[in-house]
Structure formats: structure tokens, C-alpha cells
Swiss-Prot record:
Gene, per the UniProt record: hmg-5
Tissue: Highly expressed in oocytes (at protein level).
Protein name: HMG box-containing protein 5
Pfam families the UniProt entry points to: HMG_box (PF00505), HMG_box_2 (PF09011)
Species whose genome carries this gene: Caenorhabditis elegans
Stretches for region Disordered: 102-138
Amino acid sequence: MLGTISMRFFATKVVAPRASVAASTPQVPLGMNINPYAMFIKENFKANTSDMKRTDLMKELSGKWKALSISEKDKYTELSKNYNAQKLDDFMKLSTEEQKKLVDSAKEKKAERASRRHAKERREKRKQSGRPSVPPSAYALFIKEKLSGAGMESKEKMKEAVAQWKAFTDSQKKKYTDEAKKLKDEYHVVLQKWEAEQKENADQ
């Protein structure tokens, strides 16, 4: 069953207030507002009780949205308008310091998402090129072992694993550092072979 979907998933890009707004109006956080389509998705995600994969459900809901009439979409336009107005009202009631914290936090989260997206793109590019994958670190090996079969409790187990790793002595970490070193050495051998093959192909 699908888990709870964060509001970030439905958020649309929010820019600084328009010039017509009073100069004293602060910048609102990126992603604070959601559009009618996102409101439709949000509502139907909550109503869904199937085991359908999120990507498949999104594809299905996208098709349903396109099939809605203008009058049917008006419902979500109104919901979106009311939601955004309430969010802005709540935001404006905060102190300047609290507003700034929310704006800065939203920017940091956006940067983190962009960083993860770029990292994923690099991994996919490496995979397509046939470049050997960088082996996991000792810490990553430990976390993977601890989270194996974690299921729905993965978040709690992750917290426990992180705390446990931090409390480990060097001797307790040795099993994982030795394995990581072995994998790293093997990686360099395979990488050198791959790079040599790439150079040979380029020279032909």
C-alpha cells in the first residue's frame, strides 16, 4: 500500500512576490503553493488503497486529470486557491525570523533534491557507458546489512544503525573496513581495465 506522500511531492515552484505586491511583503518559501493538478493528485493519492506502484498510479491519475471537463477541474482550482490563501495567511502571521527560516529551509531542501537528482543522472550515465560502479564504503556496507529486510520499519532501523555505527570502536568497524578495502582494490583493477579498453576503442 502506498505510504503517505509528502506535500513537497505536490508543490509547484513559487517565485518571489510580483512587483505589484507591497515591498514589505516577504518572499514566500519555494514549494509552498500547489496548483489544481497537484491538488487533484493529492486527493486521489489519499483515496487510493491499492498496492499499485506510485509510478503506475501517477500515470493513471494523469490520464484521469486530462479526461476531466473544465467544470470538473474548477473544483480543484478552487481547492488550490483556498489552500494557497490559507498557507500564505499562516505564513504572514509568523515573525520575520520564522519566515526567513522557512524560506532558507525550502531553498536547502531544493538544493538537496537537485544534488540527489544529479547524482542519480551521473550513476545512470556511468551505467550506460559500462563504467564500473564505485564500491560502497565501510559505513554503507554496515547500513545495508542492518537495513536488510527492514520493510516498513526502515526509518527506525536507519536511526538505530547510524547511532550504532557512531558508537563503534575501530575494532568493531574492522569487519566492514576490511571488506570495503577489498572491494575498492577490486574496483581499481576493473576500472583500469575498463579505461584501457575505452582508450583502445577511441584510438581505433
